[in-house]
């Protein structure tokens, strides 16, 4: 599954720079290495600096997936299957919306001077699809769409721990 | 749906989107201005500034989405339609 990448992908070239091959066995380890290098040194280029932003989006994406799975299980158990499908559709729309928003913010100040409004098409399309398909419900799909907000709050609460782990 | 309900729904939909977009629009503009100024002044904090901007934009734009959803419900899934 493709992560929430905004503009530049995180490449694992820390191995070739440092020469310590045993530390870079996995991709995540090399990402952490590269990010800690970025945090330590202040004179890097913009591609290195945006790695922190890309990692933030990746963390939000993972938390969003966990929250969505939890909400889908709860809605299957306590409501019904149609509500769960609507919730999953809304959650997918929320992920796409957040990705488009992150892409627009990533290009802010580089290729554009203002944040675009393309991401607002996603809730419009969601409401239109839910209104046209009789099996889908509006309220669960909106709740699913807004699941990105608890994900952002959880990420904001967990950020000090993640930053501490990255520095260590 | 009678004509008065239709007309009121269309007017309410326009007001919901229009009035609901004023506040977040002003807020997003000032937030983007501050973020770009911050990145220009302190380029080493670009990732952190962009992350904070993403959080604040997501929360601000949800206010616009609320108005948008109300407008779309009034237009396409109106609960007051007989």
Swiss-Prot record, chain B:
Keywords for the protein's UniProt record, in alphabetical order: ATP synthesis, CF(0), Hydrogen ion transport, Ion transport, Lipid-binding, Membrane, Thylakoid, Transmembrane, Transmembrane helix, Transport
For site (Reversibly protonated during proton transport), what residue positions does UniProt give? Answer: 61
Give Gene Ontology CC terms: plasma membrane-derived thylakoid membrane; proton-transporting ATP synthase complex; proton-transporting two-sector ATPase complex, proton-transporting domain
Q: Which GO terms describe its molecular function?
A: lipid binding; proton-transporting ATP synthase activity, rotational mechanism
Coarse class of the protein's main subcellular location: membrane
Membrane topology note: Multi-pass membrane protein
Establish whether keyword Signal is in the entry: no
Where it sits in the cell: the answer is:
Cellular thylakoid membrane
Q: Which CDD domains match?
A: ATP-synt_Fo_c_ATPH
Q: Which HAMAP family match?
A: ATP_synth_c_bact
Q: What does this protein do?
A: F(1)F(0) ATP synthase produces ATP from ADP in the presence of a proton or sodium gradient. F-type ATPases consist of two structural domains, F(1) containing the extramembraneous catalytic core and F(0) containing the membrane proton channel, linked together by a central stalk and a peripheral stalk. During catalysis, ATP synthesis in the catalytic domain of F(1) is coupled via a rotary mechanism of the central stalk subunits to proton translocation.
Which NCBIfam families does its entry note?
Answer: ATP_synt_c, PRK07354.1
Subunit structure, briefly?
F-type ATPases have 2 components, F(1) - the catalytic core - and F(0) - the membrane proton channel. F(1) has five subunits: alpha(3), beta(3), gamma(1), delta(1), epsilon(1). F(0) has four main subunits: a(1), b(1), b'(1) and c(10-14). The alpha and beta chains form an alternating ring which encloses part of the gamma chain. F(1) is attached to F(0) by a central stalk formed by the gamma and epsilon chains, while a peripheral stalk is formed by the delta, b and b' chains.
The record's family statement is: Belongs to the ATPase C chain family.
Query: What is the designated name of this protein?
Result: ATP synthase subunit c
Origin species, per record, is Prochlorococcus marinus (strain MIT 9211)
């Amino acid at each position: 599954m493709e992560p929430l990448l905004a503009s530049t992908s995180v490449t694992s070239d820390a191995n070739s720079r440092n020469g310590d091959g045993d530390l870079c066995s996995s991709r995540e380890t090399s990402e952490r290495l590269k990010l800690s290098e970025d945090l330590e040194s202040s004179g890097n280029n913009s591609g290195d600096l945006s790695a922190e932003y890309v990692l933030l989006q990746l963390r939000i994406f993972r938390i969003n997936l966990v929250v969505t799975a939890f909400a889908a299980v709860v809605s299957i158990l306590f409501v019904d299957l149609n509500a769960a499908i609507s919730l999953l559709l809304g959650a997918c729309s929320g992920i796409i919306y957040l990705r488009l928003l992150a892409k627009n913010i990533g290009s802010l100040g580089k290729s554009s001077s203002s944040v675009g409004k393309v991401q607002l098409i996603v809730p419009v399309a969601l409401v239109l699809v839910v209104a046209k398909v009789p099996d889908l419900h509006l309220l669960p799909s909106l709740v699913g769409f807004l699941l990105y907000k608890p994900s952002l709050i959880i990420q904001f609460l967990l950020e000090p721990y993640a930053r501490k782990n990255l520095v260590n | 749906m009678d004509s008065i309900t239709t007309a009121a729904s269309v007017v309410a939909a326009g007001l919901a989107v229009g009035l609901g977009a004023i506040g977040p629009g002003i807020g997003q503009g000032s937030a983007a201005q501050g973020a770009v100024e911050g990145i220009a002044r302190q380029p080493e904090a670009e990732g952190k500034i962009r992350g904070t901007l993403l959080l604040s934009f997501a929360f601000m734009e949800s206010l616009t989405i609320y108005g948008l959803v109300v407008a779309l419900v009034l237009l396409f899934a109106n609960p007051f339609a007989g």
